[in-house]
């Protein structure tokens, strides 16, 4: 393994993307894992300049606790009918930690662990809550087979080394308690060097960093990057398992070539940086092995806006089998990692 942990030992540019016939999260492929990506509300205590307008509000719009409990039960019932009894619940917002019952929700999931093959939880957060909140969180998180956090680093709010270190200390606390951490940094090209320096600040403290390309508000191609910038985004900051002593590079997604050979990337976001996210007319397990909940509406995925499965109030129906993808591309990594394969296979 390279002593320089900033760069990947694995050359992602060698992957023959035009010859790939199937891909997916390793856990979803190998462990029959059902994936739930749930936006608990759009309320956020931040208002970042580059945040998409639809992604946040200053009005508190949290999903009621009883609705959350009933939804969890119904998801598990339908998923089990399809043969899935391992679950990954990814909770986000807005800012999910300001949901008044966030810790109650993950306690509810923890109370049913013994009735599942396993349960994992994930949180996407700006981690602005005080460290006291995280001390409560880790006591619940340790009950799960796996708990993880994507911590969104926003330069407009973490504008001093003191604030950055306070942010890091919360994450190091969680990592010391077995929670897998990655810090998500949207690489605005106008501040690229500054943001790369901030990424190194955390990376040097043995915290994973995801350097994420910036997209315009309605999706589409990346904003303008130089070749050097794009190379850094595509190859920098490999994800490592810092909860293990050997810090091995962690590979999340498995890809299969048409000759049967296997390729790997450490995170689905890496595929998007290479522009490998157009799976229209492929068979996709979105809606069958995973769903997206936006406030009170249930969707097949984030990108499949036209394919509604129902609502939390009136009921929803998960697909009984994989279906053809009808969307031009997967705009976020949550969609990209869902297992899928070419129709001709």
PLM regions and their residue ranges:
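N-terminal [4Fe-4S]-dependent radical SAM core
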Residues: 1-37, 82-84, 330, 335-345
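Accessory C-terminal segments flanking Radical SAM cores
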Residues: 2, 219-345
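Canonical Radical SAM [4Fe-4S] cluster-binding loop centered on the CxxxCxxC motif
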Residues: 23-70, 303
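Glycine-rich short-loop/terminal segments
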Residues: 43, 52, 74-78, 262
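Short catalytic/ligand-binding loop motif for oxyanion handling, primarily in non-cytosolic enzymes
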Residues: 47, 57-60, 98-100, 131-132, ...
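Radical SAM/AdoMet-radical enzyme domain recognition
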Residues: 72-77, 81-90, 99-202, 208
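Active-site beta-strand/loop signature of hydrolases that rely on acidic residues for catalysis
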Residues: 93-94
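Classical nucleotidyltransferase
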Residues: 153-273
């Amino acid at each position: 393994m390279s002593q320089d942990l900033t760069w990947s030992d694995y050359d992602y540019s060698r992957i023959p993307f035009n010859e790939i016939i199937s891909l997916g999260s390793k856990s979803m492929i190998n462990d029959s894992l059902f994936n739930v990506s749930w936006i608990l509300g759009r309320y956020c205590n931040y208002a970042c300049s580059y945040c998409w307008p639809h992604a946040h509000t200053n009005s508190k719009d949290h999903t009621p606790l009883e609705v959350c409990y009933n939804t969890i039960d119904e998801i598990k019932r339908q998923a089990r009918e399809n043969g899935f009894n391992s679950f990954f619940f990814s909770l986000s917002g807005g800012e999910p930690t300001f949901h008044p019952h966030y810790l109650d929700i993950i306690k509810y999931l923890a109370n049913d662990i013994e009735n599942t093959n396993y349960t994992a939880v994930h949180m996407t957060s700006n981690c602005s809550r005080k460290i006291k909140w995280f001390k409560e969180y880790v006591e619940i998180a340790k009950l799960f087979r796996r708990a993880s956090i994507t911590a969104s680093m926003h330069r407009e709010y973490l504008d001093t080394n003191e604030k950055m270190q306070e942010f890091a200390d919360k994450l190091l606390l969680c990592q010391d308690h077995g929670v897998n951490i990655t810090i998500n940094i949207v690489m605005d090209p106008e501040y690229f060097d500054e943001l790369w320096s901030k990424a190194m600040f955390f990376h040097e403290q043995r915290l994973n960093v995801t350097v994420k390309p910036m997209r315009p508000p309605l999706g589409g191609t990346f904003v303008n990057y130089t070749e050097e910038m794009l190379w850094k985004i595509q190859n920098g900051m490999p994800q490592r398992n810092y909860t293990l002593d050997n810090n091995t590079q962690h590979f999340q997604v498995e890809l299969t070539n048409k000759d049967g050979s296997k390729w790997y990337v450490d995170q689905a976001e890496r595929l998007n940086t290479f522009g490998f996210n157009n799976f229209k007319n492929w068979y996709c397990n979105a809606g069958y092995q995973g769903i997206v909940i936006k406030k009170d509406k249930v969707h097949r995925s984030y990108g499949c806006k036209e394919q509604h499965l129902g609502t939390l109030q009136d009921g929803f129906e998960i697909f009984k089998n994989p279906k053809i993808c009808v969307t031009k591309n997967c705009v976020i990594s949550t969609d990209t990692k869902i297992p899928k394969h070419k129709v001709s296979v």
